[in-house]
Structures are given as structure tokens and as C-alpha cells.
Amino acid sequence: LKALAVLLFAGGGAWTGQAYLPWRAWGADVRTALGERRTITLADGTTVVLNTDTAIDIRFDDATRGVRLLRGEIMVTSGRDAARAVPRALVIATAHGDVRPVGTRFSVRERGDATRVDVFDGAVRIAPRRAVGRAPLITAGHGADFTRDALAGPPRVLGASAGAWVDGILVASNLRLADLLAEIDRYRPGRVRCDAAVANLRVSGTYPLDDTDRILDTLRETLPVDVEYLSRYWVTVVAARD
């Protein structure tokens, strides 16, 4: 698997054009487990924070500083590549295309049908895999989703919850309960399900990602819901019984 991973980086076109297969994450250069976050510093000074269940490959050559997101979510603070007289381009490759920062701090999340980018400082250019023409520029305080063909919609303004996971916090602001539980599900083994009867309840609050049991207890205390455990690994949030 490692040998194959190296081949993916044999030139920018070969690397970014390869099909993305789930098993490639198994042999990734850096991985995190469910519920784990990890910070690494690359040779050029770039800092990468890996969120839960994330896998990346890293490849630097004479022209490019490459990070390939195979699964999950990362926060990137781009380094200056100061050891080089001419800094190399930093490229974050995803299943849907490339993200090229312009001196910036940004996050990239693989969402299955699209890639999500949030920009906190500076700007990034997004190059969908099959798109032609100039790559759109996303500036600080904005985010965008993109597929292999194009941006999935106009850039959006970032909310207060964007990037909070780096500090181990999940921020909900009038969020559907079903959407909150889908986020919690990313951070614990097994499954967290939401019954349709309570899916549209609205939730606001700040929750600790490192203690998902506590989050579930808090929801039970503050909403008209109950939490049913078939086991620790199969949890369903349902309407509270009278």
C-alpha cells in the first residue's frame, strides 16, 4: 500500500488525477482514530491538525508541497517554505479537486459527495477535478463546497461553529437535532441514530467532543428526548415518554 501511495505523487497530474478508493486510507502516511485529533508540522513549517477518523498522504518534491486528504477533515496553517529561494506551491488534493492556499489558515473536509472548504485567514483557490477556466477564489470568513465539476453553490459566510473542533468543541446554533447527532456520530465508535419524531428539534449550545456520553446526557436533560442504548455502540435518541 505504501508503494502505491508513493506512486500517487509521481508528478502533480498523476497524483491529483488518480481515482480515490477507500482502501487507500488504510496505508496513509498519517491517520487518526475515531475521536482522536492530532497536530503535525511538515518540513516547510505548515501545520496540519487532523480531526477524528482522518487520513492523509504527504509528498514534497521540487515543485510542490502536497497533502492528499484521503478521508476526514484537516485544518491547515500554511508555512512559508523559507528554505527555498522560490517557495513551492502548497496543494491539498481531495477526491473532488485541489485546494491551493494563498498564505492562509483553512480547513478541508471530505464529505463523500463533495469537499467542504472553510477559510479563516488569507484565501484559497479551488480547482474542481473536471472544471475548466480560472479556479474560484474563496476569501477569509467564507467557505464553499465543491464537486468534481464545480462549486456546489455560492460561497457562504462562516458561522461561529466553523473550526471549533480544533479546540475540541462542537458549537450548535439553532441546529437540527438530527444534524447534531450526525456530528456526534463522527467522534464515537458504533452508531448514533436519531428517531424521525425528534429529528427537527432545534439545539443550541457548546459541547465537548472528547466526552460524547456527556453530550447525550445533556440532550436528555434539556430536550424532550430519551437516549436508548442497545449497547454502547448502538444508540438511538427518541421522543421522551410521558
Q: What residues fall within each predicted segment?
A:
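Single-pass transmembrane signal-anchor helices and their membrane-water interface zones
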Residues: 2-25
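Short acidic/polar N-terminal linker immediately downstream of export determinants
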Residues: 19-42
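Short, small/polar residue-rich loop motifs at catalytic or cofactor-binding pockets
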Residues: 34-36, 61, 111-113
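His/acidic/aromatic-lined binding-pocket segments of jelly-roll/cupin-type domains
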Residues: 39-40, 47-48, 57, 65-68, ...
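Extracytoplasmic/periplasmic/luminal assembly and interaction segments
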Residues: 48-93
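Extracytoplasmic/secreted envelope proteins and their assembly/folding machinery
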Residues: 66, 71, 89, 121-123, ...
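Short, polar/charged, low-complexity connector loops/linkers at domain or secondary-structure junctions
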Residues: 84, 89-94, 99-186
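N-terminal export/assembly leaders
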Residues: 150-242
